[in-house]
Swiss-Prot record:
The keyword Amino-acid biosynthesis is annotated on this UniProt entry: no
Alphabetical keyword list: Cytoplasm, Hydrolase
NCBIfam families: PRK13241.1, urease_gam
One Pfam family matching this protein: Urease_gamma
Catalytic reaction equation(s): urea + 2 H2O + H(+) = hydrogencarbonate + 2 NH4(+)
Record-given protein name: Urease subunit gamma
Pathway this chain belongs to: Nitrogen metabolism; urea degradation; CO(2) and NH(3) from urea (urease route): step 1/1
Amino acid sequence: MKLLPREIDKLLLFTAALLAERRKKRGLKLNYPEAIALISFVVLEGARDGKNVAELMEIGRNVLSKDDVIPGVSEMISNVQIEATFLDGTKLVTIHDPII
């Protein structure tokens, strides 16, 4: 199977998000890459489900709380930007202060 670089990136993101989700379910606090991966994955899947940018900005802010991440991680992430494919094309979704 031959994948484009963008498709490889999406698969890597999915793998990291799956790992983060499993660790969160086990009660472990997430680190920076895991937090970014999980938030990004939720936004990408929401776009695939037909949600709009405004909905995804709100959903993205509710994926994780400060209790879900290692101390200091929430301060490191001021915003997350994800390029997602919607029914009407590709758009940039920006989530400000994603971990509250």
